[in-house]
Amino acid sequence: MDQPAHAPLRLWVTRARPGAEATAARLVSMGHRPLISPLLAIRRLRPRLDLTGVGALAFTSRNGVAAFAALNPERALPVFAVGDATAETARQARFRDVRSAAGDVAALAALIIAEPVEGAVLMAGAREPAGDLPGALEAAGVQTRPAMVYAAFAASGGRGLTALRAGKLDGVLIHSPRAARRLTGAVGGGGLAHRSSA
């Protein structure tokens, strides 16, 4: 039997559920050993969504798509998605007209600006968004309507922190700036640098 080209890495997946499971499955398929221990937890909010005057939807994450889809049956409005994974989530939720910026918030803003929308762009996203999509769009004269459909809350990450402190990890996967801040706050900047250099 052939030996693997490399030893499996022990990797802490800090991503919130349910995305953490997909990341872990991919790591397993690559021969690694993931440890799921989220630093953030996603909670859907229940805002009243008024789509009057809305000409398109914008999503900066898969969580935004899932939360909006659970709140509202609208699927005919054009959807602008930050990346391919978010676009695929929108298609799976039965949105009919989905376009991917295949990038970041700046790329998403550029895509929306390049394809004029009649009416406002409703941005269904996090209570504390990572980027300033409304600012970029409004600077270009695009009407925006933010809708906070989910929030990320701190989770303990206890199992991951314990494994990190015990030197039982080869790496840590961080999926957002907020999770990175949470991790450095939990272990201290110097402690993280020391452990990650091992």
Stretches found by the model and what they are:
Residues 1-198:
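Signature of uroporphyrinogen-III synthase
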